[in-house]
Design a protein with these regions (language model features):
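Positively charged, low-complexity intrinsically disordered leader regions
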Residues: 1-27
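Conserved hydrophobic helix-helix packing surfaces used for dimerization/oligomerization
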Residues: 29-31, 156-157
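Glycine-rich phosphate/diphosphate-binding loop of Rossmann-like nucleotide-binding domains
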Residues: 36-50, 132-221, 234-242
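Short beta-strand elements in bilobed, periplasmic/extracellular small-molecule ligand-binding domains
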Residues: 53-67, 181-183
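Short, well-structured alpha-helical segments in soluble
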Residues: 73-85
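Glycine-rich phosphate-binding loop
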Residues: 86-96, 101-104, 197-230
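Anion-binding alpha/beta catalytic cores of soluble intermediary-metabolism enzymes, centered on
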Residues: 92-152
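Rossmann-fold NAD(P)-binding glycine/threonine-rich loop
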Residues: 102-119, 123, 226-277
């Protein structure tokens, strides 16, 4: 039976530690989330982030903007937040309405307040092995692996999905830790063959049953980033959890695996930004 990599418990531990640090340091990290439109999934994600930020003692604000918001209006809002010394982290909830270019918007956030880690400056730093601000989901995956003492050195790591949110930064974090990394995508030939040789499998596609028992080798480690809602209403990942759990050595559940860690890393990066701004050294 596989070890279940419990992201929910680890995220709670990290949040409790952050709350204690905020109280001891008397620093009040400021986090603003910009939500444009009424996307139901985004509403849930933002609500979870707001609740978590308030629990650890942050000054947390969610600015809800109408679906009709123009790119210029959003950029002006970001400009104001960039100049506000009480704000240490700015997050724009994706996806944005079609009239707004998300890349232009993300680049408008100054790198020091880019707690999502999506700014080209921060991604470029990651390329140079500077992990000061890293996309939150890959960072959360690394922390989860470290918590369970899963060493990546010399391991064959297969990442399914090449987004700048998960796949590409995850590949760099894996390389930084001595893994041999292969990134698979929609044009990868014979995906099952690639998966079969992997020691570490990270799937971030959004396709149920993409990874099955017959695809994975014994004692592999699986990180399931996918979130899929079935017609029954059940939330599942990309991996057939019940099918593979007796085959692999460790696996993240969905929900309760990577998702909580993403929020925990968002809070941690906001806190570290606040410490840097206030000249408090961790």
């Amino acid at each position: 039976m596989a070890i279940v990599l419990d992201g929910k418990s680890l995220a709670l531990k990290i949040r409790q530690e952050l709350k204690q640090k905020v109280e001891e340091q008397e620093v009040k990290p400021g986090l603003v989330v910009l939500l444009v439109g009424e996307d139901p999934a985004s509403q849930i994600y933002v609500r979870n982030k707001e609740r978590a930020a308030n629990e650890v003692g942050f000054h947390s604000v969610v600015e809800r903007l109408p679906e009709t918001t123009t790119q210029e209006e959003l950029l002006e809002k970001i400009k104001t937040l960039n100049e506000d010394d009480a704000i240490h982290g700015i997050l724009v909830q994706l996806p944005l309405p079609k009239q707004i270019d998300s890349q232009i918007v993300l680049e408008a956030i100054i790198p020091e307040k880019d707690v999502d880690g999506f700014h080209l400056v921060n991604l470029g730093k990651l390329l140079q092995k500077d992990e000061s601000i890293v996309p939150c989901t890959p960072k959360g995956i690394i922390r989860l692996l470290e918590e369970y003492k899963i060493d990546l050195t010399g391991k064959e790591m297969i990442i399914i999905g090449q987004s700048t949110i998960v796949g590409r930064p995850m590949a760099l974090l894996g390389l930084n830790r001595g893994a041999t990394v292969t990134v698979c995508h929609s044009r990868t030939k014979d995906l099952e063959k690639q998966i079969a040789r992997a020691d570490i499998i990270i799937s971030a596609v959004g396709k149920p049953n993409l990874v099955l028992r017959e695809h994975v080798k014994k004692d592999a480690v699986i990180i399931d980033v996918g979130i899929n809602r079935l017609e029954s209403g059940k939330i599942v990942g990309d991996v057939d959890f019940d099918g593979v759990k007796d085959q692999v050595s460790a696996i993240t559940p969905v929900p309760g695996g990577v998702g909580p860690m993403t929020i925990a890393m968002l809070l941690e990066q906001t806190y570290l930004n606040a410490c840097k701004r206030e000249n408090i050294y961790e």
